[in-house]
Regions:
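P-loop NTPase motor domains
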Residues: 27, 141-436, 451-452
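Residue-level signal for threonine
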Residues: 101, 271, 524
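Basic- and hydrophobic-enriched, low-structure N-terminal and domain-boundary segments
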Residues: 1-153, 157-162, 204, 498
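Short, solvent-exposed coil/turn elements at secondary-structure transition points
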Residues: 201-203, 444, 472
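P-loop NTPase motor core of the ASCE superfamily
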Residues: 241, 245-251, 256-259, 356, ...
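Alpha-helix N-cap/helix-start and coil->helix boundary motif
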Residues: 178, 417, 445, 474-475
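Composition- and surface-driven signal marking solvent-exposed, interaction-prone regions
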Residues: 33-40, 380-382, 424-425, 481-482
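Short hydrophobic alpha-helical runs that function as membrane-insertion/retention elements
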Residues: 170-174, 195-198, 437-442, 466-470, ...
């Protein structure tokens, strides 16, 4: 700040001396000239005579007054320009957007190339938690990157691949079809990574994932239940227009079942298979009131432990009329039917993935492989991602520096296809300080809006880096990216014709930095 002020003082002093010199020289020429006042003024304004004897200054009153007057006039002109409300920005009147240069990206780079997040061949983003801060600029950016590119634009191999090959983070990847695993799995192993795979496409080759391994209290139970109910719908992105009692009743029932397994059964029974075993008991009804064996279990629990979360949630579910409760049973049963598939039962009976290892300084990479032809099992991926975020945030918050020892990077290819992570718009705004970052990959703006509805803007705002691999043919995306590029001022030749005479002059107009069609070819 002090250096900047000194520079400003020196500039003002130099400008004042220049103005005084010019005024004094003009005063000398005026005094020495002969003739009328007009002739003497013309002589004083003769540039060739002014510079002919540049050091011929005079202490006489008129030249000195001319020098001081020149300083005052220059100062007055400066103040008028600055405070008149008309800011002059030559050739920027209609916009100052321009293409970035190497000098623009340089402050955001780490001195070690291996500690950057590569974005393009020439642009990267430092992984450093703290970047330079000056009086004019704050170069700190969160590590969230959002990518837009239509099918075939190379999102996987040109974005996810280069970020993986930096080997500077622990990685969690959504991997439609398993192509990233096939390409980079062995490379990561050769670099000392412990590679884990949750494979919903080829489940015989999958590590095991048990949501109960990461449940520690009722809060975790509520999160898992809500996530499952949300993502086990045919289209999780579709707003619920039916009576809320169906979804709320299903949620209460599922919370009761999860809580009973976790709090009332031995650790070896803590898995979704046990939940389904309880659910089956609802089918065995007896007596004129149609009671089920599950009713008896929770009635006994309520008598033994009145404050039990499981008993209370079951009581909320049981407040529904009999026909409504039976409809809730059928609805939840249909949603939970995937847990009756033998291969799903097998990979969810215990846990070998150990999500907590991602929060350590150990090198770990987790590939979540999902089929690209069906979304039937993506609810499990959505639950895993949410639990993973929870574990990482909890671990960071319990460290002295509230930061993970090793950056954890989520490379979420085809992000809309893994279901919905509840409250993701809140999550992405809070993970930066924990040394966590996301690369979200979409095909278009429309996909982002469809996935998270009114919250799409919040997610976009919390991604400081945006990478566009062409806009495809989606008009909404093309218009959006074109507006983001802004306008620049260009000079054009305007020709007029008047009474047979032709004249021309230059004018400045505002022009988009790139048209919608040009935006198709952008790699920014």
């Amino acid at each position: 700040m002090k250096e900047q002020r000194t520079k400003q003082v020196l500039i003002c002093l130099a400008a004042s001396l220049g103005c005084f010199w010019l005024g004094n020289r003009m005063g000398v020429l005026y005094v020495s000239a002969v003739g009328t006042v007009t002739q003497r003024l013309a002589a004083a304004a003769n540039l060739s005579k002014i510079v002919l004897h540049p050091l011929q200054l005079s202490p006489a009153p008129i030249p000195v007054c001319c020098g001081v007057g020149a300083i005052l006039l220059a100062g007055l002109a400066y103040l008028c320009i600055k405070y008149s409300g008309h800011r002059l920005v030559p050739q920027k009147e209609y916009g100052s957007a321009r293409w970035g240069t190497a000098a623009d990206i340089a402050p955001f780079l780490h001195e070690k190339p291996s500690e950057n997040i590569p974005l393009t061949a020439t642009e990267s983003l430092s992984l450093a938690m703290k970047m330079p801060v000056t009086a004019e600029n704050n170069y700190n950016r969160n590590k969230n990157v959002i990518v837009f590119g239509p099918s075939g634009s190379g999102k996987s191999y040109s974005v996810a691949g280069p970020q993986l090959l930096q080997f500077n983070s622990n990685y969690v990847l959504s991997d439609p079809k398993g192509e990233l695993l096939d390409t980079y799995g062995n490379v990561l192993v050769s670099q000392g990574y412990d590679v884990k795979v949750f494979n919903l496409k080829d489940r015989d080759k999958s590590d095991h994932y048990n949501p109960f391994a990461y449940i520690h209290d009722t809060d975790d139970i509520v999160v898992v239940a809500k996530n499952l109910i949300k993502n086990m719908k045919e289209d999780p992105r579709q707003k619920n227009t039916a009576d809320p009692i169906w979804e709320e009743g299903s949620t209460s029932l599922l919370e009761a079942l999860l809580a009973y397994v976790y709090f009332e059964q031995p650790p070896e029974k803590h898995n979704m298979n046990s939940v389904m075993e309880l659910f089956v008991l609802m089918q065995h009804r007896y007596g004129p009131q149609g009671r089920s064996q599950l009713d008896d279990i929770f009635e006994d629990l309520a008598m033994e432990k009145p404050a039990s979360f499981a008993a209370r949630q079951y009581g909320l579910y049981h407040m529904a009329p009999d026909k409504t409760a039976q409809s809730i049973d059928v609805s939840l049963g249909m949603r939970m039917s995937a847990f009756n598939i033998p291969s799903i039962m097998k990979i969810c009976e215990d846990d070998t993935i150990h999500l907590e290892e991602l929060a350590s300084d150990k090198k770990v990479a987790l590939f979540v492989v999902t089929p690209d032809t069906t979304t039937a099992y993506n609810f499990l991926a959505a639950v895993m991602f949410q639990q993973c975020f929870q574990i990482l945030v909890h671990t960071a918050d319990n460290r002295e520096d509230h930061c993970l020892p090793r950056h954890v990077r989520f490379l979420l290819d085809e992000f809309p296809n893994i279901g919905m992570i509840p409250d993701f718009q809140i999550l992405i705004s809070t993970i930066r300080s924990r040394n966590i970052g996301c690369t979200l990959i979409y095909q278009s703006i429309a996909q982002l809006k469809s996935q998270y509805g009114d919250d799409w803007g919040t997610i976009l705002e919390n991604c400081d880096s945006e990478l566009v691999l062409g806009g495809g043919n989606n008009p909404e995306s093309l218009e959006f990216f074109g507006k983001q590029l802004g306008k620049r001022t260009i000079e054009v030749l305007n020709t007029t014709e008047n009474l047979g005479a032709q004249g021309s002059y230059n004018i400045f107009v505002g022009s988009p930095t790139a048209s919608s069609r040009v935006a198709i070819q952008l790699v920014a």
